[in-house]
Amino acid sequence: MRVVLDTNVLLAAFATHGLCEAVLEQALASHQLVLSEHILDEVGRHLAGKFRMPATRAREIVRFLREQAEVVEPARVGPGTVKDSTDLPVLGTASAGACDLLVTGDAEILRLREFTGIPIVSPRECYERFAR
């Protein structure tokens, strides 16, 4: 299964652990993680800024993710799909990566339920799907 993990899921995986960490581990072990430079840049910026992680550690995490994932250029997504334009590249990543699943904790993206035929699920829903 080809899976995009949104920035918020990756941040939770590395900053707070728990469910999102388990989802990331499952994605890496049994599925193909698909990311974009947009998502990787957000992860690095927020880990070092918002989560006050040392910059060297944040860079190591981004490097690790880049090595483990297939990194794609997001497809263009028309404005108006979601209110927050910074969410458009996340949807575009799922589309460009021909993904089977987009995992996010973002309520606005979750409201879409699917995008171009790609199911959009919460980390909990993803965890349950992976457990099947």
Specify the residue positions occupied by each region the protein language model found.
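Amphipathic coiled-coil/heptad-repeat helices and related helical stalk/stem segments
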Residues: 19-20, 58, 86-87
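A secondary-structure boundary/capping signal
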Residues: 6-7, 35-36, 105-106, 122-123
